[in-house]
Amino acid sequence: MDGAQFAKMLSDKHLFELNRMEYKYSTVSVKEFAELLRQNFAQPLPLTDFSGNKLFYLPNLAQISTNGMKQLLSVPVSGQNFGLSAMTEEIYATFQIESIRSTRSRIRYILDGYAPRDEQEARIYGMKRGLEFIANRQNRITEENLHHLYQISTGDYLPDEDRLLPNHFYRHGEVFVVGGEEPRPGLPAERLPGAMKCLVDFANANDGINELHKAAILHFAFAYYHPYFDGNGRTARLFHLWYLVQQGYPAALFTPFSRYIAENKDAYYKAYERVERNALISGYTDVTPFLFYFCNEVYNRLQVDAVPPKTDLEVYQTALAEGKITEKERLLWEYVLSAYGAEEFTTKQLEKDFRNAAYATIRTFVMKFHEMGLLTARKAGNRVFYHVGGTSDGRPL
C-alpha cells in the first residue's frame, strides 16, 4: 500500500468502523491497512482477547484535551472523600445506564448518611460504600480488594442465583453480555482467574502508559471479560475511578463520569461493539475505538463541579491562614463545595443538610463568604439563592 492511500485511510472519519471502510476501500485494502497499523503504530497490551491473543491500542489516535487533563489533575479543596453533588449525579447516571429507576433525592438521602428504607435505597447504599472504599488511597488495587469492592457495592444486594460462590472471586458459570445489538458470552469461567490476575497486574504496572488511557483500557477489559453474573458495568466504572484515585487524580470523585455516558449510552455500547466487530475483520483486538469514545465523550467534556476558580481559593486560603475563618465556617465551606458544587442552595437548605449548625451560624457564614466574593447571591422574591463563585463587587444583598 502506498503512503498516500495509507494516509487517506488513516484520516477517514470512519477509521474505527472497519466494516464501513471495506465498502469504501475494499476488503483487501482494509485488511492490509489494519495489519500496517498493528505492525507500525499499535502498542501491545499485557491482556488477552478470548482467543488468547494480545490486545492492542493506538495511543496517538485517542487524544485528550489539555483542559480535561487539568480538570482531573486539580485538587478539590473539600475535605470530603467525594463530591456529594457530583456523586449524586454519578450514581443517578449509573442507574440510568443500567435502566434502574431511582431519584436524586433518594440518592442524596443515603449519601447524607441516612439508613436505607427499602431495596432501592439499599442499592444506593451499596454504591456509597463502594465510593467510600475507592476514595481511601490505602485500599490498593488487588484481587482481594476488587472482590471486596464488588461485594459491598453490588454483590451483597443481588438475588441468590446471581451471587458468587463462597471463596470464589469470580463467576463459576456462563454469562451473556447485554446492552449492544446482540448478546454475547463473557469470557469462559475457567479462564477468568488468569485473565483477572493479568488485569490487576496491569493496573499496578509502571509501564509509562498515559494514566487516563489506562483507566479507560481497564474499564473496557473488565466489562469485556465480564467476571460476574451481574453488576459488571457498574464495577467497571468504579474500577475506572479507583485507578484514577490511586494514580493521584483526586478530582475523579468530584466528577460525574457516568453522566456523560448516560447522555448517550448507545455510543458507549457501540464503542464496545466496534472493538469486537473490527477484530473479526483485522484479525486482532484493538481497543482504540473505546478509548476514542471515552476521550471525546467523557474526558474532553469534563467539568469538575466542586472546584471553584483559583482566585477564589487564594482568597479563602489567605483568610484561613490569617485566622479570619472559624472552624465551623471552614467545615461549612467544605460541605458547600462537596454537597452543592455549582448548584444553588438557600440558608434553610444548608441548615437542614449540614445538620450541625444553628441557623444564625449559617446566616453569618453565607453573608461573610458572599462579602469575601466566595459565594454569589441571587434574589428571587423573598428568597436568596447562593452558589460557589464570587460576584463582581462582593456586596451583600
Residue ranges with predicted function:
Residues 1-229, 233-397:
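FIC/Doc superfamily catalytic core
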